[in-house]
């Protein structure tokens, strides 16, 4: 049985998940998820949130268990840092600055930009006085610009298998691109949101920092649990290991396979595996 992260109705209330927008700003398509009105504010039906969140987490778990990549998307100010932190924590990928049209549907061009970013990084790391200070400043400026745009996906290695979105109104272009490519969409839907094109809707407050933090953390926790399950299923002892990188998962599975032909059928957390070896994912650390 899948052991998904636990949460309660009280957790949702304490994070303000139930608070929607003013009634004048609502989207009628969200009517099935609205409990009522209080002080001219729509109140989200948390029973719907609980059911649909569990459904979304279950689907996410299955995708990651099959070694799928997850792309976190949230470019609004209050979501940006949380999106980056939680995607990085579980070894996944993110866009938290600005969605560039074609990031999914024109992946080949994005791949060229990623290659250019890596070239700038390599160039700036191996400078032997061959460039002037002015040239180096120009290179750094170009590197920083690319890093802001694609730093969170430069190690993704291909299209994601699912996207998780905060604020569907703001990220509508990303959702349309995912729909075109049949990439499943998990999204938090506020009372002013349009649920069209969302495969796994989660009714909830997408503006309050505590609510955003709650949703991003539980998504990240689910991803980590799926990765742990995958490694454990393959005979790898995950006791004592806190964080895992999807990128490195294949390495550890291969390592375990090699070990089976030698001494042991398992890889223990204390067998010279450093935590830094298990953490990867996004290029952007800060």
Curated annotation (Swiss-Prot):
GO molecular function annotations of the record: structural constituent of ribosome
SUPFAM superfamilies: Ribosomal protein S2
Keyword terms: Ribonucleoprotein, Ribosomal protein
A Pfam short name: Ribosomal_S2
Taxonomic superkingdom: Bacteria
Record InterPro entries: Ribosomal_uS2, Ribosomal_uS2_bac/mit/plastid, Ribosomal_uS2_CS, Ribosomal_uS2_flav_dom_sf
Keyword Electron transport (UniProt): no
Residue span of region Disordered: 257-286
GO terms (BP aspect): translation
Coiled coil regions in record: none
NCBIfam families, alphabetized: rpsB_bact
Protein name in the entry: Small ribosomal subunit protein uS2
Species of the source: Ehrlichia ruminantium (strain Gardel)
């Amino acid at each position: 049985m899948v052991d998904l992260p636990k949460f309660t109705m009280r957790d949702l209330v304490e994070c303000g998940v139930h608070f929607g927008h003013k009634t004048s700003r609502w989207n009628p398509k969200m009517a099935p998820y609205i409990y009522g009105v209080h002080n001219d504010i729509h109140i989200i039906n948390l029973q719907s949130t609980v059911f649909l969140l569990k459904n979304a987490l279950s689907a996410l778990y299955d995708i990651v268990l099959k070694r799928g990549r997850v792309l976190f998307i949230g470019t609004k100010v209050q979501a940006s840092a949380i999106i980056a932190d939680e995607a990085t924590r579980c070894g996944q990928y993110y866009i938290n600055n600005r969605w560039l049209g074609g990031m999914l549907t024109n992946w080949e061009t994005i791949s060229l930009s990623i290659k250019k970013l890596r070239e700038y990084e390599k160039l700036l790391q191996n400078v032997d006085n061959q460039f002037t200070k002015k040239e180096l400043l120009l290179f750094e400026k170009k590197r920083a610009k690319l890093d802001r745009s694609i730093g969170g996906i430069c190690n993704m290695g291909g299209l994601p298998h699912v996207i998780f979105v905060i604020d569907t109104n703001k990220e509508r272009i990303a959702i349309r691109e995912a729909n075109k490519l049949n990439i499943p969409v998990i999204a938090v839907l506020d009372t002013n949101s349009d649920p069209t094109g969302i495969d796994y809707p989660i009714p909830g407050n997408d503006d309050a920092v505590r609510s955003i933090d709650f949703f991003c953390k539980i998504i990240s926790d689910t991803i980590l649990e799926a990765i742990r399950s995958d490694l454990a299923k393959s005979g790898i002892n995950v006791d004592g290991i806190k964080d895992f990188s999807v990128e490195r998962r294949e390495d550890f599975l291969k390592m375990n396979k090699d070990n089976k032909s030698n001494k042991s059928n398992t890889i223990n957390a204390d067998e010279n595996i450093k935590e830094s070896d298990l953490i990867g994912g996004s290029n952007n650390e800060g």
